[in-house]
């Protein structure tokens, strides 16, 4: 790949990456993606013990010690979720169709003879979002629900090779995330007999802020056939403020209008994770990989509290507090994949990823569905000179969950509310290497 093409691709990808903050992400292992990079996507996300590409810095940072010289990767994944909702007031309703582009760029550099390698990545890490329009509400109106969570990071990474067959590594993730939602924003209902049971629709726009976490990794090649890896990433330190929230008080007898508030969101973060992997090379043309990971959602997402302060209307409540009960569960994820080098230029891949649904049925709402469990993927890589082109397609099979919780404070959509979630993901990548 010539220098002009390198600069052009980097410029284009950087532009797209900066633009990712204009689009929400959809994820399939809770709020994380099953994989990062088309090569890894093709084998179902199994990569902890392989980790021999630049985007390994987002899986197992120790893996970049296997690279010599300068290595670059550009990747674009496009997610197409398919969501349906049904409850006692609404027949089965399709979510608004949306496509979510998720770019990634990574660079790794290591001098021959040096045990040190370092890298830098820009990645769309994950998130979630759903839009349901024209829903019947319990208040005689038709309205919408909408949500989006977006999360991207800059990831500086360093690895140290203890010897040619063992390495350790560390990454620091510094990024930005924001969240928005609309919950029947055009509906306003005042209950004169029981004012406490009135309903005033709400909408929050882009409460966001800095997100930081750390990842450490270990990689060991036991012999020419077996390699092993392990990783741990801390829970993200999250901040969500600077949002704008409006409450629809049009039906309120004293206010009669929408009121805007400064919004913050607390109790929402991205889970810590731990994992281990094994790779087996029965021949020079085959790689079989298996990963097990644990996402600690139970500590990360319980009750998410949105608070509005500083109303722009005199006489409005000085503070509005909206609690959303999530109570997510810890999640086991299993990834199994294979690479087959059919020819010196062509590699074929296939993989399976199973991630337990972390969302309890009693807290599920169409605002934040993240329920898919089973994923099947296929992919291919084409080597031309010092450049590799990768492609993968993943199907997240439909997961249907019904919330029978009668408590309207937790399940405002009523017993029998059902959400179906399936998804297609297509990934494209190009990587190349140069000498120092």
Task: Label every model-predicted segment.
Residues 1-12:
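Bacterial N-terminal signal peptides that target proteins for export
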Residues 20-26:
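Bacterial Sec-dependent signal peptides at the C-terminal "C-region" and cleavage site
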Residues 26-41, 86-92, 99-436:
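Outer-membrane beta-barrel porins/channels
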Residues 31-47, 65-83:
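Transmembrane beta-strand segments of Gram-negative outer membrane beta-barrel proteins
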Residues 45-53, 90-95:
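Asp/Glu-centered strand-loop micro-motifs enriched in Gly/Pro and often flanked by an aromatic residue
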Residues 48-70, 107-115, 127:
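Outer-membrane beta-barrel pore proteins
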């Amino acid at each position: 790949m010539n220098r002009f093409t390198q600069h052009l691709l980097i410029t284009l990808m950087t532009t797209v990456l900066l633009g990712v903050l204009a689009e929400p992400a959809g994820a399939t292992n809770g709020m994380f993606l099953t994989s990062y990079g088309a090569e890894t996507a093709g084998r179902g996300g199994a990569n902890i013990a392989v980790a021999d590409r630049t985007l390994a810095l987002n899986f197992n940072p120790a893996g970049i010690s296997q690279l010599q010289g300068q290595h670059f990767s550009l990747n674009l994944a496009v997610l197409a979720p398919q969501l349906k909702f049904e409850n006692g007031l609404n027949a089965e309703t399709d979510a608004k169709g949306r496509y979510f582009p998720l770019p990634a760029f990574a660079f790794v550099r290591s001098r021959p003879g040096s045990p040190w390698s370092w890298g830098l990545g820009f990645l769309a890490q994950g998130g979630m979002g759903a839009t349901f329009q024209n829903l019947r509400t319990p208040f005689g109106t038709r309205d919408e629900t909408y949500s989006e969570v977006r999360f991207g990071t800059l990831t500086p990474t360093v690895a140290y090779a203890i010897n040619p067959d063992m390495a350790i590594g560390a990454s620091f993730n510094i990024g930005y995330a924001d969240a928005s939602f609309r919950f029947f924003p055009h509906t306003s209902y005042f209950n004169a007999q029981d004012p406490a049971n009135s309903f005033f629709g709400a909408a929050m726009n882009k409460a966001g802020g800095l997100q930081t976490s750390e990842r450490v990794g270990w990689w060991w090649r036991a012999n020419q056939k077996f390699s092993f890896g392990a990783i741990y990433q801390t829970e993200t330190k999250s901040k969500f403020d600077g949002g704008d929230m409006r409450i629809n008080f049009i039906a309120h007898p004293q206010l009669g209008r929408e009121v805007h508030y400064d919004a913050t969101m607390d109790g929402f973060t991205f889970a810590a994770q731990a994992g281990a992997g094994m790779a087996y090379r029965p021949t020079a043309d085959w790689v079989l990989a298996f990963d097990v990971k644990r996402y600690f959602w139970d500590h990360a997402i319980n009750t998410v509290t949105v608070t509005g302060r500083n109303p722009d209307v005199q006489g409005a409540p000085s503070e509005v507090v909206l609690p959303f009960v999530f109570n997510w569960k810890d999640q086991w994820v299993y990834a199994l994949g294979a690479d087959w080098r059919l020819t010196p230029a062509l590699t074929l891949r296939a993989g399976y990823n199973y991630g337990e649904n972390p969302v309890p049925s009693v807290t599920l709402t169409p605002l934040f569905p993240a329920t898919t469990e089973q994923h099947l993927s296929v992919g291919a890589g084409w080597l031309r000179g010092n450049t590799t082109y990768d492609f993968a397609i993943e199907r997240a099979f439909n997961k249907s969950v019904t919330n029978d919780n009668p408590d309207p404070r937790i399940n405002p959509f009523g017993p029998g509310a059902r959400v179906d979630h399936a998804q297609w993901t297509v990934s494209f990548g190009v990587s190349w290497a140069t000498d120092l």
